[in-house]
Amino acid sequence: MKVKLQIATAEDVSSLVALRTAVNAHLIAQYGKGHWASGSTEKGVLFAMKRGTVYVAKEGQNAIATLTLSTRKPWAIDTKYFGASKRPLYLTSMEVSPDRQRKGLGRQCLDEARRIAREWPADSIRLDAYDAAAGAGEFYRKCGFREVGRAIYRNAPLIYFEMLV
């Protein structure tokens, strides 16, 4: 399946909540509760839509993947670790339906994020990931992101990643 990301609208909110809830339940079932185990609400999705641009990949009316890009630096990211990018975008969240994970959909979403960043125009994509069993650090490395630093957030190790576009 070739993924097509589109900007999420208010009509997508309930489907995005369902997707994020399924991903959260999957992570808890695999790794137990942790910093990654946060609930999702319509209010939270609408807030994400105000602070950034939420993209969604759908099958029919159901969200199967989503990611959020923003020009706003998340407060947990320390820019001293990153390069001299003049126009960074921040990947602030990404979820893929548990039944679609490990099938290339996440990589396709990041390829689309890279394309979107070039058109924005941005010169890099920055993100953080937990350095824990539930973290996606290895996935981001395999997709071409470069580790640029590490920090502790809420007593959990974070890895900062950057990709020049």
Predicted feature residues:
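Conserved N-terminal entry element of GNAT/NAT acetyltransferase domains
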Residues: 1-14
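Conserved GNAT-fold acetyl-CoA-binding loop/helix
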Residues: 17, 21-44
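A short helix-loop-beta-strand connector motif used in the catalytic cores of GNAT acetyltransferases and
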Residues: 44-56, 73-74, 90
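Conserved beta-hairpin
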Residues: 52-67
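Conserved acyl-donor/pantetheine-binding loop and adjacent beta-alpha core of acyl/acetyltransferases
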Residues: 66-93, 101
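Conserved acetyl-CoA-binding loop-helix of GNAT-fold acetyltransferases
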Residues: 96, 102-115, 138-142
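Conserved active-site alpha-helix within GNAT-family acetyltransferase domains
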Residues: 107, 119, 131-149, 156-157
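Conserved GNAT acetyl-CoA-binding A-motif
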Residues: 110, 117-129
